[in-house]
Amino acid sequence: PDHIGLAGWFAKKFNVPLCMSRTDYLQCRLLAADTGEYVPHEAIDFYTQAGLSEKQIKNYIERFGFFGSIIHKLPDAYNRIKHGDVISIAGDEWECIEGRGHTMEHICLFSKAKNLLISGDQLLPKITSHVGVFPTEPNANPLDDWLESCKRLIKLVPEDVLVLPAHGRPFLGAHKRLKTIINHHEESLNKLEEFLATPKRSVDVFPVLFKREIDDGNFLMATGESIAHLNCLIERGLVSRNISEVIAFYE
C-alpha cells in the first residue's frame, strides 16, 4: 500500500497519467480486486502447509482483501515504464532500473547528470526490504531474483551516487550497502541449511531468520519471507520439501 496508495488520488487530483511498470500495475489491480471476496482455498492450504495455527488462519481470513480498502482506486489505464527506459522529468533525464524480489517489477530512477538514485524499496540504508512468497505463486523464488537485482544495481550505478530511499534518510555508499544486503541473505541461507538437518516447518525457522519477535501483526510477512528462503534453497538443490498430513516439512 505504501507503494501505490495515493497514486490514484494524484492522478485524479492533478489530471495526470499514472506511469509505472506493467507487472506491478496488474498485481495491484489483482490485489485490490480481492476486497469483499471469499478467501481462496489455495490461500488457506498455503498457510496451513506452512504450519500456521487455526487462530492464525482465522486472523488471515479476517484480514483478507484489506489492500483494496486502504488505497485509492487506480486509474483504469496507465503508461508503462520498463527497465532501460529513459524518461524526462522537469527537463532532466532519468534511467529506469528494474529490481525484482520485493515486488515483481520495482522501478528505480537514476539520473547520471545529478548522480542521484531514487531507489524506492530496492535499496534502503538500515533495514532490508521484505522478500516473500505469496499464495498466488507458492513455488516462487523471489530471493534469488532479489539477489540478482542487487548485483545488477552495483554494475549500473556508481559507488558515490546519492541514494534517495523510500524509508530512512538519503545516504552514500550504495555498493557497500548492496554487498552488505547480499551477504546478509547468503549468511541466512547458510544458517537455514544447517538448521534443516532435521525436518522443519516454515514457522519453525523463524528464530534462524528473524531477531525480532514474530506476533499476530507480522506473522504473515514472516511466513512469506521464510518460504522465500526455503524455496531458494530448494531451487539451489540444497534442501527438499515433503508434505505430511497437509503440513510441508523441509530438510
Model-identified regions with their sequence ranges:
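Metallo-beta-lactamase
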Residues: F67-Y78, V86, E93-L189, S202
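Short hydrophobic/aromatic-enriched beta-strand-loop microsegments
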Residues: N15-M20, I118-G120, I181, D216
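Active-site HxH/HxHxD metal-binding segment of metal-dependent hydrolases
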Residues: P1-I87, N115
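Residue-level signal for the nucleotide or nucleotide-sugar donor/cofactor binding architecture
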Residues: G5, N141, M221
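Short, contiguous alpha-helical
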Residues: K12, G99, I234
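C-terminal regulatory/interaction regions
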Residues: N190-E251
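Aromatic/hydrophobic pocket-lining residues that form the small-molecule binding cavity
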Residues: I4, W146, C150, S226
